[in-house]
Amino acid sequence: MRSAQVYRWQIPMDAGVVLRDRRLKTRDGLYVCLRDGEREGWGEISPLPGFSQETWEEAQTALLTWVNDWLQGSEGLPEMPSVAFGASCALAELTGVLPEAADYRAAPLCTGDPDDLVLRLADMPGEKIAKVKVGLYEAVRDGMVVNLLLEAIPDLHLRLDANRAWTPLKAQQFAKYVNPDYRARIAFLEEPCKTRDDSRAFARETGIAIAWDESLREADFTFEAEEGVRAVVIKPTLTGSLDKVREQVAAAHALGLTAVISSSIESSLGLTQLARIAAWLTPGTLPGLDTLHLMQAQQVRPWPGSALPCLKRDELERLL
């Protein structure tokens, strides 16, 4: 016998969270909980403002329609990426497809203070990997910060994310301030320039490896092995169903590319599921999930070791 609940929620964010020039004051989303007999499965639907095509309200309408269809016996999935991902996760939990084992390691997001990063990395098992957002300030400053970190921590590898912020000139200004001897320890730089061709040229000219992120969601993107391209960053909330995520990971691995499962600032419930997906589909690759500290609370399922308060399901607004 099938049954379902849908919950709506809103989590206050830390004051300094800015996405594409807009301050994110709250993180808004939905949960779906599916039951079939004794089995239960949860999924999170939380479109990311400025990145998702669908709004939270559109996702809610699509989710409620899909849940009603599922209760009638339908087996399809919604079209909207965030709804397709959340619904497919709930189904994967319900049917036992999504393994319980999780990779709760996370590449720490660094604000540029090497002393703070040394402390955070001290307890990290295995290779030392951190992530730095670049492109928010002057490119020269970014280059100096990255160089400082790589110089201060000799076994550090950095993942950098520019979100297509730079012109070719700005990208070159950044590279100029990174010692060529350190560049091999930049694991990859996500989407440095506004166009893929400019990003490819940057990789060739500087020897700094790049990764595709936004490109994966463009209609003309195809997976190819290219000079200077080392990785793809997959954000499931922006990608679609779990099957689509698996297809993208498989396509990347077939070409020898690293596939990184990455957060779209999901709640703790969604992040714990992403940690399970990462352990399942990209074992051995550190996922990019260090975003919980941007929020003021957890919900339903806590992240191991987090001191943030965790709301229970009966504290959420129920829609169905």
Swiss-Prot record:
Active site residues of this protein: K133, K235
GO process annotations (BP): menaquinone biosynthetic process
GO molecular-function terms, A-Z: magnesium ion binding; O-succinylbenzoate synthase activity
Binding site for Mg(2+): D161, E190, D213
EC number: 4.2.1.113
SUPFAM superfamilies: Enolase C-terminal domain-like, Enolase N-terminal domain-like
Pathway in which the depicted protein is active: Quinol/quinone metabolism; 1,4-dihydroxy-2-naphthoate biosynthesis; 1,4-dihydroxy-2-naphthoate from chorismate: step 4/7; Quinol/quinone metabolism; menaquinone biosynthesis
UniProt keywords, alphabetically: Lyase, Magnesium, Menaquinone biosynthesis, Metal-binding
InterPro entries for the chain: Enolase-like_C_sf, Enolase-like_N, Enolase_C-like, Mandelate_racemase_C, OSB_synthase_MenC1, OSBS_N
Similarity comment: Belongs to the mandelate racemase/muconate lactonizing enzyme family. MenC type 1 subfamily.
NCBIfam families: menC_gam_Gplu, PRK05105.1
Protein name per its UniProtKB record: o-succinylbenzoate synthase
Organismal lineage: Bacteria, Pseudomonadati, Pseudomonadota, Gammaproteobacteria, Enterobacterales
